[in-house]
């Protein structure tokens, strides 16, 4: 589990089994995998599966995710999944302040963003982007004393927000600062149950 890290290198590592994901990384910058493999021990391995979920999973990371020269086999899910985490607008306090919440029942209680981050707004029903980007002035949990366990954040911005940013319009918030570039090259993916590679980022892949 990699969180709140920078310039992490995982080289020449073989992972043979995990009850969940093989590698989970979030809120981290620049992750370098070279020869990182999720694989059976060999042709005579008694197991049929390696991980019960994704081999590698990256959520709300930034900088560069570099994954090269790996073998990913016999997973119950993807070899690599890169994505961000949207918040949903729940209340507009004033022209610069919102309450926004995590919506996934298994994904909450961690940092989503920081003062100075840049975000954009998206219509959740059509995936259309609203014009412009906006900078966070301050962000704090609203429903808990700390980020741990929090589902709702109070977010103040440095500039006035579009009039469309209301809960009635079903608006999502994407943190552009915490989106990575991805290089996934010279890897082998085989014998897995689900998909291969998933990249959900507005940056270069």
PLM features: residue spans?
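Repeat-solenoid scaffold signature
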Residues: 60-74
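A generic structural motif
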Residues: 97-102, 137, 141-165
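Glycine- and charge-enriched low-complexity intrinsically disordered segments
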Residues: 157-178, 183-184
């Amino acid at each position: 589990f990699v969180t709140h890290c920078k310039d992490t290198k995982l080289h020449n590592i073989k992972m043979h089994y995990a009850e969940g994901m093989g590698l989970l990384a979030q809120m981290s910058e620049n992750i370098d995998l070279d020869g990182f493999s999720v694989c059976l021990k060999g042709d005579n391995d008694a197991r049929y599966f390696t991980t019960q979920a994704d081999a590698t999973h990256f959520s709300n990371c930034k900088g560069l995710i570099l994954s090269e020269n790996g073998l990913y086999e016999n997973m119950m899910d993807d070899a690599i999944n890169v994505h961000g985490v949207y918040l949903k607008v729940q209340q507009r306090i004033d022209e610069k302040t919102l309450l926004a919440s995590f919506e996934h029942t298994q994904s909450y209680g961690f940092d989503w963003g920081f003062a100075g981050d840049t975000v954009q707004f998206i219509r959740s029903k059509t995936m259309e982007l609203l014009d412009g980007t906006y900078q966070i002035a301050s962000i704090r949990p609203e429903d808990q004393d700390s980020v741990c366990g929090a589902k709702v954040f109070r977010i103040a911005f440095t500039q006035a927000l579009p009039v469309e940013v209301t809960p009635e319009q079903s608006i999502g918030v994407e943190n552009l600062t915490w989106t990575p570039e991805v290089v996934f090259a010279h890897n082998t993916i085989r014998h897995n149950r689900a998909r291969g590679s998933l990249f959900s980022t507005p940056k270069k892949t």
